C-alpha cells in the first residue's frame, strides 16, 4: 500500500510537469517534499516568534501540533478537534511567502493545481485528501515501524544506524547541490551546502547574506553571485562599499560561486544529458571527498550515493527517450528550422535539467523521516564537522541589533560621510603625470574654507595678491587711488632709472611685465589711521600702451583696496615710506 501511494504521488508530479506552463511560472520550479515542508514550517514559526517575542526559536511540541493543524487546514479537512496555535494566520503567510520566494511548491499545492485539470484527473484519481494526509503525516508507515521496537538493539545495529545516518547526510548534500543547480532561488538547499566542504562560511557569513538578501529582496544565492560578479568584473567605480560586511567572506563566497559556475558550464556545454549528469555528479563527489580519508564513513557514503544517482539518471533518460519515441510515431519527423536553432543554442542543457527535475521529484515523493526531532534539531556537525542545523543558520540577529551603541552626534556622522566620499573620489580619480606640482583636492577645499571663514582676510585680498606680485600692501584701510592729487611720490633717481629702462625696452612683452612690476614695487600706501582722501601716484612718461596697462592695474588695485579693513605692512615698508617722504 505504501509503495502504491508513493507511486501515485510521483504520477501526480509527472502530470504537473507536463502542464507546468499553465500551472506555474517557471519550468524549474521544484517540488517541496514532506521533510522540506516541515523544515519550512519550522522556520516560519520561528520567524513569527521572533516578530512577537524577539526570539528565533520554537519548541518541538508546537511544531508537531501546528503541523497537524496545517495539513488538515490546507487540505480542507475538518479541524474541530485540533487545537490551533496563536498567530496561525501569520505563520501561514510567512510559509507561503517563503515557498514563493524560493520558487517551490509543496505536495499539497501540486495536488490542488492538478485537481483543476479535469481532463487528466483519472491518472491520479486514487489520491484523495485523506490519503495524502496519511502520507505526509507518516501514518502509511506506522505498521512497519511497530516491528522495529520489539527487536533488541545490538552493537551491529547501532553501527548500521550510524552508517545509515551518514548515507542520508551524503544524499541530502548531493541533492541540495542538484536542487540549487536547477533552482537558484532555493534558500533551503543553499543552507545545507554553503559550508560543505569547509569554505569558512559559517553562521556569520550566512547571517550577512540573509540580511543582504532581505534588503535587496533577492534570494541568498543570487545576492552572493551578484557580490562576487561585482568584485570580479565591476572595477573600482562599481566596487561594493568598504564597509560591506560581505567583504569579510570574499574568499569563501568566491570559492562557492566558482564551483556552482563549474557545474553550470557542464550543464550548458555537454549536450548529452547522460554524460552531463555523470560529470556533474563526479565533480560534486570529488569536491566532497577532497582531503578525506578513504576509510572514512562519509567518504564511502558519498561514493555510493554518487554511483547510485548516476545510474538513476541514466535510467530516467532512457525512459524519457522511450516515451518520446512512442509519442512521436504519428508525427512527421520534419521540424521547423527555428525549433532546431532554439534547441541547439538557447535550450542547451534543457534535457539535462529535465532529467535532474525527475530525480528531484522522485526524492520529493519519498516517505517522510520517522524521527522528527532528529530532522529538525539535530546538528549535522555530529556527522560532518562543518554541518549545522537549518534553524541554527537562520537564527541571526537583526541589523538593528548588531550595534547597540547610542547614535553618534550629527557632526561625527557628517564628517564620517565626507571622509568616505573623499576616499571614494581618490580611488576613482584619474590624475596627470604632473599631479605632483599641484595641490591635492582636499588641501584646496581646506584653503577655500579657511579663506571663507576668515574675517580678517576677505576674498578680495586674493585678487590683490594676484594683481600685484610684490611690494603692494594688501590690507590698506579703504583708500581710493587716483591720478589727480595725493602725497605719495617717486624718487628722482628712481624715475630716471624707470624712464631709461622703459624707453629702451618698448615693444618687448617680457620687458613690459618687468616694468609694471618695478612700478608696482614703488607704490606705497599711507597709514590707515589718516582720514580717507584721494591719493596720487606720479608715474614717469612711458609709451602709451604701457601707460594704459599701468592705469588699468592701478584701478584694479583701487577697487580691491576698498575691501580691506586693516593695515598690514610688509617688512621694511615703513623705512622706505619715510625715505621717500623726505
From Swiss-Prot:
One of its GO terms (biological process) is DNA repair. Gene3D superfamilies: PCRA, domain 4. Required to suppress inappropriate homologous recombination, thereby playing a central role DNA repair and in the maintenance of genomic stability. Antagonizes homologous recombination by interfering with the formation of the RAD51-DNA homologous recombination structure. Binds single-strand DNA and poly(A) homopolymers. Positively regulate the poly(ADP-ribosyl)ation activity of PARP1; however such function may be indirect. The keyword DNA-binding applies. It is found in: Cytoplasm; Nucleus. GO terms for cellular component: chromatin; cytoplasm; nucleus. Its main location: cytoplasm. Residues 471-514 are annotated as: Disordered. Interacts with RAD51 and PCNA. Interacts with PARP1. Interacts with TASOR. It comes from Bos taurus. InterPro entries: P-loop_NTPase, PARPBP. Signal peptide: none annotated. Belongs to the PARI family. Residues 471-487, 501-510 have a biased composition (Polar residues). The keyword Nucleotide-binding does not apply. Keywords: Cytoplasm, DNA damage, DNA repair, DNA-binding, Nucleus. This is PCNA-interacting partner. One of its GO terms (molecular function) is DNA binding.
